[in-house]
């Protein structure tokens, strides 16, 4: 087994575009190459940048640790049929809790939700029953599961910060679905996302928790903020894919015969590859004028090619390592 290791010192600015006023523009030092182990990759100079924090938390994480003596447990079980549907899609929009999706050879969807409510009083428990609901939308070939409540807003992320309501409702989703299904699933707090045995496209998001995917044969995006991202492919992706975290390692496992173009970003971490790679040229910096401002979109990715190249696979993190490994399972 040949493992290629190349240390990187990529910058925080590589994660976000930099906006400068026309009066405050100063010359940017030309990036200088650094000698590192094979393959040789040029490392960019650091630039200051301000990192926006995620704004998707419905309540603070500490709310779940409050003294909430009144508790209630409930199990929701339902089944749905995708028989005869030419295209199958699943969407889950959770807030508190985990998500597990496992592919099967059946056309049926088996849903189990373990709902746990913790409240300050019986009145608050009754309030939680009324305010927090699981909305289910079933159409031809499409199943949507949406956790609704007073924490929801009409912003792009679907939830916003509110004062503590006096209760916390956690829903853990477990689903058995057809293998050839496209999935869009996300959660925010107190849960991990696990996906196994899926052949379709995927969009997987988390905030405070890890993402683990195994035996995957599709292409897509997996992103979290606080936690690792681990994906093992049964069949290498045929289309562009994207994997990202801020605090955690990213570990991707591919089968033999991998041919792809990788573009990496990391700040505090190293990049490892089981596959021999060759360096790709650095892409040009893009400059955009917006009135009195000049916005620089600098491509600070480290680009490498595996074999003859193929779909572009982007991998980003801030604090953690990136590992590109060969899947022997």
Task: Tell me what each language-model feature is.
Residues 2-329:
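Intrinsically disordered, low-complexity terminal regions
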């Amino acid at each position: 087994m040949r493992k290629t290791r190349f240390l990187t010192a990529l910058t925080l600015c590589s994660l976000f575009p930099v906006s400068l006023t026309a009066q405050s523009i100063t010359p940017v030092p030309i990036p200088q190459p650094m000698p590192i182990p094979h393959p040789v990759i040029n490392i960019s100079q650091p630039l200051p940048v301000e990192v926006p924090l995620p704004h998707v938390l419905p309540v603070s994480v500490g709310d779940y640790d409050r003294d909430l003596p009144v508790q209630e447990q409930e199990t929701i079980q339902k089944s749905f049929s995708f028989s005869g549907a030419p295209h199958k899609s699943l969407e889950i929009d959770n807030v508190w809790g985990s998500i597990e999706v496992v592919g099967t050879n059946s056309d049926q969807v088996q849903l189990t939700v373990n709902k746990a409510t913790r409240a300050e009083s019986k009145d608050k428990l009754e309030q939680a029953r009324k305010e927090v609901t699981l909305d289910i939308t079933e159409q031809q070939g499409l199943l949507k599961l949406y956790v609704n409540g007073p924490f929801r807003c009409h912003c792009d992320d679907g939830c916003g910060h509110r004062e503590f309501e006096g209760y916390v409702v956690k829903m853990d989703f477990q689903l058995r679905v057809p293998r050839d299904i496209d999935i869009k699933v996300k959660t925010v707090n107190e849960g991990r996302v696990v996906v196994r045995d899926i052949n379709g496209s995927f969009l997987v998001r988390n905030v405070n928790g890890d993402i683990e995917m195994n035996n995957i044969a599709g292409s897509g995006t997996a992103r979290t903020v606080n936690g690792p991202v681990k994906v093992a492919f049964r069949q290498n992706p045929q289309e562009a894919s994207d994997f990202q975290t801020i605090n955690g390692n990213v570990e991707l496992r591919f089968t033999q015969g991998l041919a792809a173009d990788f573009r990496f970003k990391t700040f505090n971490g190293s990049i490892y590859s089981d596959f021999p790679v060759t360096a790709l040229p650095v892409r040009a910096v893009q400059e955009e004028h917006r009135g009195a401002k000049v916005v620089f979109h600098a491509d600070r990715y480290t680009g490498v090619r595996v074999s003859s190249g193929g779909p572009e696979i982007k991998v980003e993190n801030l604090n953690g390592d990136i590992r590109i490994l060969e899947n022997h399972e």
